[in-house]
């Protein structure tokens, strides 16, 4: 309940870059023989690689507001947890991020495609991925300021662990 109206709101996470560089390299190829542009043209219903925050309107419908409140792009997110982390009466939002490898990086995929399609056939694509470093990202936490405003306070609250996190648990210990 992000707005304290007594109605349950919910969020679904996905992979949207939190900065311009990450956003662009994760888009995939838009042209060429190995293009991933089909993904944009043919899905039904369309799928968007970003978080979705659904606000309960108290009717039969929810309103999707992740872009409106600044929570749509939190990198390669696995877990979303709502909780009043600073005891101010508002539900804050915590995201865990990271991946074993950067599988959505279009630049890497294109480079690997060139290498694996070459005449030399030195390495398989799986070998190339194995040699890549894990895709380490910082976890993020956003303070709920009320009135549908959120502020990234990850480093202030020291919850910006840099690595690969695929889950989390939240509990009130006292």
Locate each region found by the language model.
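Acidic, glycine/proline-rich Ca2+-coordinating loop motifs
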Residues: 1-174
């Amino acid at each position: 309940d992000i707005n304290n109206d007594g109605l349950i709101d919910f969020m679904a996470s996905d992979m949207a870059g939190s900065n311009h560089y990450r956003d662009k390299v994760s888009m995939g190829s838009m042209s060429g023989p190995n293009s991933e542009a089909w993904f944009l043209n043919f899905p039904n219903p369309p799928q968007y690689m970003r978080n979705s925050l659904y606000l309960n309107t108290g009717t039969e419908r929810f309103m999707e507001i992740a872009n409106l409140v600044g929570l749509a792009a939190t990198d390669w997110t696995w877990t979303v947890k709502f909780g009043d982390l600073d005891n101010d009466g508002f539900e804050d939002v915590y995201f865990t991020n990271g991946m074993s490898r950067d599988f959505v990086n279009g630049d890497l995929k294109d480079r690997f495609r060139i290498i694996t399609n070459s005449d030399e056939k030195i390495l398989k694509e799986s070998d190339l991925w194995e040699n890549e470093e894990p895709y380490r990202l910082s976890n993020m936490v956003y303070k709920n300021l009320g009135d549908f405003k959120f502020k990234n306070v990850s480093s202030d609250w020291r919850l910006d662990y840099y690595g690969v996190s695929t889950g989390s648990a939240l509990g009130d210990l006292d």
